[in-house]
Amino acid sequence: MIERGKYQSLTMINWNGFFARTFDIDNLVTTLSGGNGAGKSTTMAAFITALIPDQSLLHFRNTTEAGSSQASRDKGLYGKLQAGACYAALDVVNSRNQRLLFAVKLQQVAGRDKKVDIKPFLIQGLPSHVKPTDVLVETVSDKHARVRQINEVKDAVGQIEGAHFKSFPSIVDYHAQMFEFGVIPKKLRNSSDRSKFYRLIEASLYGGISSAITRSLRDYLLPQNGGVKKAFQDMESALRENRMTLEAIKTTQADRDLFKHLITESTNYVAADYMRHANDRRNKVGQTLVLRGELFSSRETLIEQNSLLNRVHEELELLVEQESALEQDYQGASDHLQLVQNALRQQEKIERYQEDLEELNFRLEEQMMVVEEANERVMQAEERAIISEEEVDSLKSQLADYQQALDVQQTRALQYQQAVQALDKARRLLDKSELTAESAQALATQLKAEQETRTSELLALKHKLDMSSAAAQQFNHAFELVKRVLGEVARSEAAKQAQQVIRQAREAQNVVQNEAQWQAQQRDLERQLEQQRSVRELATQYHKQHRVVLDDAATVELERERHSALLEELETEQENCREQRGQLRHQEQELQTQIARFESIAPAWIKANDALETLREQSGAELADSQSVMAHMQQVLELEKAQSMAKDKLAERRTKLDSEIERLASPGGSNDPRLKGLADTLGGVLLSEIYDDITIDDAPYFSAMYGPARHAIVVSDLSGIKEKLVELDDCPEDLYLIEGDVDAFDDSSFNAEELEGAVCVQLNQRQMRYSRFPAIPLFGRAAREQRLELLREERDDVVEQHAKASFDSQKLQRLYASFNQFVAMHLQVAFDADPEQALATARDKRNQLLRSISEFEAQEQQLRSQLQASKQALAALDKLAPQMGLLDEETLEARYHELEEKLQQLSEAKAFIAAHGRTISELEKVAAVLDADPEQFDALEQQYQQADQALQQLKAQIFALSDLLERRHHFAYSDSVDLLNQSSELSEQLKAKLVQAESERTRSREELKQAQAQLSQYNQLLASLKSSHQAKLETVQEFKQELQEFGVHADEGAIERAQRRRDELQERLHTSRSRKSEYERTITSTELEMKALVKRMKKVEKDYQDLRTFVVNAKAGWCSVLRLARQNDVERRLHKRELAYLSADELRSMSDKSLGALRLAVANNEDLRDALRQSEDNSRPERKVLFYIAVYQHLRERIRQDIIRTDDPVEAIEEMEVELARLTEELTQREQRLAISSDSVASIIRKTIQREQNRIRMLNQGLSNISFGQVNGVRLNVKVRESHEILLAGLSEQQAQHKDLFESARYTFSEAMAKLFQRVNPHIDMGQRSPQVLGEELLDYRNYLELSVEVNRGSDGWLQAESGALSTGEAIGTGQSILLMVVQSWEEESRRLRSKDIVPCRLLFLDEAARLDAKSIATLFELCERLDMQLLIAAPENISPEKGTTYKLVRKVFKDHEHVHVVGLRGFAQTEKPKTAEQKFAEELAGELTE
């Protein structure tokens, strides 16, 4: 027997009062005894926390919170912990004898919410000698220990061999591990299950009858029949999916036309544009090649004609060049003549102005002398005026101040003495004693005149001396100039060499003046030589081309006649070529007509041929002619009929299998569904239901033993059955009834003997039945399920075969329809000759004709070239004829060389002038000094010294006279000497002098004014003369500058030469223009012939360049289009050969029509609408392909893969026709097969209710002997709700009345159930629940039952268990009994979910057990012992149970630290466990050995 798992211990680490405490959990009852605050509730809280570590559920209330719904903020856990890491660990040994330590790490989280961080973990495989505290607490010293953190715990466990540490990220995983190892009785999948488990623990902890549990006993006691509900949900889901698929098929059938329309129009739209671009590209490439050939031939012809024309133009260009030079020379000569004439007129102006300038110069010199004399007179007048002013002022000051007057008179006396001394000095120097102050002025004037004369003489000598000195310098300068030109020259030869150099320079100037004339003559000779060379080249070229030497005019005339005759002959041959080419053109037009006819019939033939190839692929036949097509069409029709018959047979077999499967799947597997109803009517059970759990091996035996009675009804009593049978309306032909206990039925009533493969049953003394074991037994659920599996496999095979047959039938129908369509549309042309092959032959012939035409055109071109050559020869002869005289002209070269020598001399002369021109110009100015004698310079210098000495002596005399003249007015102060002695008369004399001085002052002022006025007039006249002289001088200089800018030497000979030169050039220009007109008339005919060819070639070249650019630019786009089409596998859809024969306008019209249809078709699809709008850009053809790909992708996405399994929309459209009908039929049948009857639903629900009633009856048996106080028994009462019983009756007995609900496609089965419930219970308000929700509730059997708890209390009998009707102890005991029932129910419910070798732990809690008396506690102990349950209770100190383990808890405080002192006691009334038979045998054996 498998032992139940047990809790071994509870370990608390770092809780309030418990630093590291382990409580051993007794196998029966563990009691925590102590006073208030001792720590009993804390210990239970640690146990519950380790069991359910969900802080959202944990809530440890105390008695002060009895009426509170929220309690304290920390929910009783935060305050029970110490700071730091805390642990609560449960040590468990399960049924497999595995030691498990389920623990949680708790830690307070700082904050006002007082939350606790909980982390669950598991330690598995700890050795038995290792305590939980050894892992969770680290011993630091003998008296100190430290709580380990969870990582340290993990490391410590890792060091223990065989131990494993596992943490859990969620509580669900933690509880799943607990369930697997048998620690908790129920699998807690979610928070709802955890809440139920916690409510159960909480109800156990606080005792009494929990209203939370009694109100929802169905959820706690009745297991959820998930399989039934899931079956219903799966059935509804399958029906819903089936109906959705049917709707999808209808939608797909509607989409089929859209598919066809969209794919047809998009194919037409894109393929037409695709083929239009392909045709256009092919045509453009062909046109490009044709134009390139024509361009190359035209270029060759043009090159030939151009070479001919170039030779003609060379002569014209030469003549034009000569004419241009002549025009330039003529224009230059005219300009030179005009320039010479202008220079002569300018020279005349200069001479006239120079005469005026000389006259002005003479008048200017005279006026300057007059102004000089007037200036001297003004200065003398100013001096006299100043002296008179000073005299007046002096006399006035003397009169004003007598002392001053005396001083003045003394000064004047001194001045008078100095004047007398000056007079004596002048007499001595002049050696004239008679000299007086009055006669000094005349003598001074005389001496001044003499001074001027001597000064002039001295200046003349000075000038001669300077000239002599300058002559010596100029001689040296001129001699240096001669040496600069000629190099080292003797001094005596300097004058001669200078004259020679000047002469050479003049000759060079004369040579340079002939420069223009010689250059013009050179150009004339060059042109004549060039003409001679051109004529000789023409003659040489003509000799090379025609092998004829042109040496005279007669030969030229003969050649002209020969070429004229050749021209006539070539023109005749050219006409013949044109006629033959016209005939070939006619034949080419006939072939073009045939090609057009073939092109017109080719599209229809291509469509017919494609349809024929499709038929051949579909049918796999040759189909060589129309007769074979008709014959094969008949064969397809016969095959289709045969396939339809095979399909019908398979459908019939499938129906039989479905009915048999449905019969075997029904309860009991009865052949007759009425038996179940009869069993309910008679109050019995089908025999097959009783034996429903037998094994497959036993099924043949029991099936043979019961024989025909295997579908009998077992009733508890046969009395009164006959009356009920008589009242039956509908009953099978044979109905077997067997009397027996339904709950404990056996086969003892049958006398059966098993034989070899059979059973022999002795019915009575005279009857015996022999039944062989059936080959396929159907008795028992296992046998039926085995048979069902085989039948379902067979049915799947039949369904697959039927689907294949349906597909083949549809395929044959489609093939027959394709034959019909082919016969109607394409049979007439499908077997005609291939027009494309005939078209290729015709095109080859046409190409041959075109090549022949090209050969004739080439021949004609050759004739034209010969004609052109002859014409060019005639033109060359015409050009040579007038210039034949130049061929033998030999003097041109000699004249040209002579002129080149003159030009060489000219270059040398220009180089000489450029090198020495300036030097020679300077030399020419000073050449005369070379003849002068520089040795006379010394005598002249001595004469100059003597004259200078005499002049200096004269200047000393003049100075003495000047000093005398300056002091002559001082002689008037002779009286001052006397006045110094006669001071009394001084004043009167001063006054007289003042009057005399004032009159003198007035007279001198008038003289000064007259002199100044006269000087002003003279100055004005001088300024006017100077301005006139300056203007004339500037004008002359400007005229000279202009004359110099003319750059010509103006003389009478120059103008005569210029006129003669101009007249000569004018005559030559007239002659050249006449010859140019002749040349232009000669080449006009050649230009006209080339003009047409050039025009044609330019047009062809432009067309070729445009076409080639178009082809090259389109190539990249076309390559991208092809790449897109091939990568997306749409090229075969777009490249339609029949469209290649349509014109571009027809294809464009086709594309535009489809575009209009597509705009309507994609109006509601944004992606396709945008793609279509972008594809309308004709410059981007790849966008149309992208649109086509988008349509394909869109249709692929629209293809339902559950109906059609292909990615190609075109193939999908073809498969739709085949698949839709078959799928519709199959889905309709599947819906009928999936639909469950209301009777079956009622039967399943009733059977489930009956099973649960029996299970609760078994649970009640375990609680029947429980007693708490006056309570002598506890039981659960279960009954079916009246409203739901009416619903079950309506489902099973009134099916016909409710067909509108269950056979309607508008409602699901759940909705039909809800509608039926409302129909049979109109008085019940359904609230806001939807029919679907209500229907799902009605499919759960638990909603049909009502559960209540009843107690047998004293004389009152069985009463409803309510807290108000029971004492506290009775309520606690009753509540514990109910909780035990719930735990036992959970274990039974979860048995199939856990391993068979696991029996889960059972443990309940009870706080404040003092409310129970000793008898009640003993009852609890008995209940725990009987049900193998552990109980953890808390009781005050006055409770001392006799059994189990008791812990005495006392909380002690030492200084600021408190801890709980714990003492454990074993119960004093412990009874030994009963020994097993093996133990007794072992003890007896040990005793015998001892003896």
UniProtKB/Swiss-Prot annotation:
Primary localization: cytoplasm
Record: residues binding ATP: 34-41
Coiled coil: 302-450, 490-600, 781-806, 836-1109, 1210-1239
Record NCBIfam families: PRK04863.1
Localization terms from the record: Cytoplasm, Nucleoid
CC per GO annotation: cytoplasm; nucleoid
GO biological process: one example: DNA replication
Subunit architecture: Homodimerization via its hinge domain. Binds to DNA via its C-terminal region. Interacts, and probably forms a ternary complex, with MukE and MukF via its C-terminal region. The complex formation is stimulated by calcium or magnesium. Interacts with tubulin-related protein FtsZ.
Taxonomy, superkingdom: Bacteria
Spans annotated as Flexible hinge: 667-784
SUPFAM superfamilies, alphabetized: P-loop containing nucleoside triphosphate hydrolases (SSF52540)
Keywords per UniProt: ATP-binding, Cell cycle, Cell division, Chromosome partition, Coiled coil, Cytoplasm, DNA condensation, DNA-binding, Nucleotide-binding
Name assigned to this protein: Chromosome partition protein MukB
Record family assignment: Belongs to the SMC family. MukB subfamily.
Described purpose of this protein according to its UniProt entry: Plays a central role in chromosome condensation, segregation and cell cycle progression. Functions as a homodimer, which is essential for chromosome partition. Involved in negative DNA supercoiling in vivo, and by this means organize and compact chromosomes. May achieve or facilitate chromosome segregation by condensation DNA from both sides of a centrally located replisome during cell division.
UniProt-annotated stretches for the region Disordered: 1059-1080
Molecular function in Gene Ontology: ATP binding; DNA binding
The record's note on its domains: The hinge domain, which separates the large intramolecular coiled coil regions, allows the homodimerization, forming a V-shaped homodimer.
